[in-house]
Design a protein with these regions (language model features):
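Intrinsically disordered, low-complexity polar regions and short flexible loop motifs
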Residues: 1-229
Length: 229
């Protein structure tokens, strides 16, 4: 379970489930993930100014969800989106319209409209895409003007992602990416001195040092075997 704060004009909000605090987030931020048991769960969102929202949801065993605080005409509400599973080797993407002042919107990927007149709070189906970068545009269906120009969305193989379009009421419209699911790595995790493998693709210094020692030993052996003149 993750929590997305998409209520403009509201300060840092805190979400709890059955009395247990899950996390806090400011506008456009995401808290979590948190693991919850399946079954009926009572969520409470609290924010400054006496804002208190409540939602009761039945969580299915093994499913993943994102709880989003969304604005309404006069206040706010909680909406729970069920997340899709990841597909090994593929990238999956959907878009959620969470910017009320945009009205209905056309959504385009790499210049092609893939969702017509998406309404506020709507979630598109997931699209299965090749890993890489997708250019997202949000367009006004009437004027065809772009509410959001092209935004490059990085999509990795084996991941499922939701792009939440948030904003309005003084908050600039933007895209917030939320990780919905990830497939398990196909290879066993690397281990070494200290039990940690490099995470940024940098060199493994323990292996580099061992290689240097091996090369040095080989050079010394060759020198010893070289006949004297």
């Amino acid at each position: 379970m993750r929590f997305l704060h998409a209520v403009p004009g509201v300060g840092v909000a805190t979400v709890s489930a059955d009395g247990q605090t899950l996390g806090s987030a400011g506008f456009g931020q995401v808290a979590g993930p948190a693991t919850l048991p399946s079954g009926t769960t009572h969520f409470v969102l609290k924010a400054p100014g006496g804002v208190t929202l409540k939602k009761t949801v039945r969580l299915a065993d093994g499913d993943s969800y994102t709880l989003a605080g969304l604005a309404t005409a006069n206040a706010a509400t909680i909406h729970v989106y069920r997340n899709g599973a990841a597909d090994p080797g593929k990238a999956r993407l959907r878009v959620v319209h969470a910017a009320p002042e945009l009205g209905d919107a056309n959504l385009a990927l790499d210049g092609k409209v893939v969702a017509h007149r998406a309404a506020y709070e709507d979630a598109t189906d997931y699209w299965t895409l090749p890993p890489g970068r997708e250019q997202l545009e949000v367009r006004d269906p009437g004027s065809k003007k772009m509410a959001i120009g092209m935004r490059a969305l990085p999509l990795s193989a084996g991941t499922t992602t939701t792009a939440y379009v948030v904003g309005s009421k003084g908050e600039r419209v933007r895209v917030v990416l939320v990780d919905d699911a990830t497939t398990a790595p196909s290879a066993a995790p690397q281990t070494g001195l200290g039990g940690l493998a490099p995470r940024d693709g940098g060199p493994n210094w323990a292996l580099a040092a061992a290689a240097a020692l091996a090369i040095g030993g080989a050079i010394a052996l060759l020198r010893r075997r070289r006949p004297s003149r």
